[in-house]
Amino acid sequence: MILNTGARTDTVQYYTEWLLRRFAEGYVLSRNPLFPNKITRYELTPDKVDCVIFCSKNYAPILPRLHKITDRFHTYFYYTITAYGRDVEPGVPSIEDSIQTLRKLSEIVGRQRIAWRYDPILLTEKYTVSYHLETFARMAKALAPYIDRCIFSFVEMYKKVEVNMPEIILLSKTDKKALAQGLGLIGDKYGIYIQTCGTNGDYTRYGIHPSGCTMLDILGRANDIVFKTRKHKGMRQGCHCIENRDIGAYDTCPNGCKYCYANKNLCKAMENFKNHDPASPLLLGYVRPGDTIVQGVQKSFR
């Protein structure tokens, strides 16, 4: 089983105490977002979890105690650092601070376990194609020695994104081509393996690799382990990732990113964050009368 700690929320930045407690106690409960009365229990032990993957925009809160997880589990880290400022990502540290934190993370876990996510790419009057490429080049130069690869995607124009960011300029085919070509050239210059995420077109002619973000070969090489050959079913349409289980909850991230796919309502997310109990086995709330707890299937890929 591959355990995902951060697809639904930034668990690392805002729920570090809870996350560490879950690993210390050896289990976690996850409420089904589609069927709220159904809760799944997962055992957090090395014999049940093949690899723990992290997704965050700020690893600083967990760095001093990250060894409590990495000493016991195979791991892989996705670190999102974009070109945007607080006008788009109000709760995210500056680019400079993020680069420094990634370097520290790399020193702890090794560059082979870190993927830099530069996504989603979106355009506004401020964040133009040239702005992205200039910023990406500066970041790539600084990050190249500390990462395994870089993953990018173009923004998905969900209805809530259109509502929250009316200033977004729709990406044309020409824009995407210019961005992909530019990213490919920069990646080649600094020796960075660059790949797409999801259904973002074919840009192999620019040195961009089409792949899933969470592939068994990526996790295996990073941790020097061999996984069985498995079909990667993906987590959604167009996704090429290996199936994994997320232990977070939607509408719980206070970052306030305007393009956020996971939050429907920032006010609700802030309220949920305020009411969070680090001692609960659930990230959000408690087991309620009428809830059904089932043991999750934790089949090994090894």
Positions of PLM-derived features:
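Conserved Radical SAM active-site core
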Residues: M1-V88, I95, Q100-S106, R111, ...
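Auxiliary alpha/beta "docking" domains used to position bulky ligands
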Residues: N58-Y59, N164-E167, Y193
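A C-terminal junction/extension of Radical SAM enzymes
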Residues: T174-H240
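Local cysteine-cluster metal-coordination motifs and their immediate loop/turn environment
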Residues: Q237, E243-N265
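Surface-exposed cleft-lining segments at the edges of enzyme active sites
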Residues: Y84-V92, P120-S130, N164-L171
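Active-site beta-loop-alpha junctions enriched in small/polar residues
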Residues: R8-D10, K57, T80-Y84, D119-L123, ...
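Conserved C-terminal portion of the radical SAM core fold
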Residues: D97-V163, Q181-G198
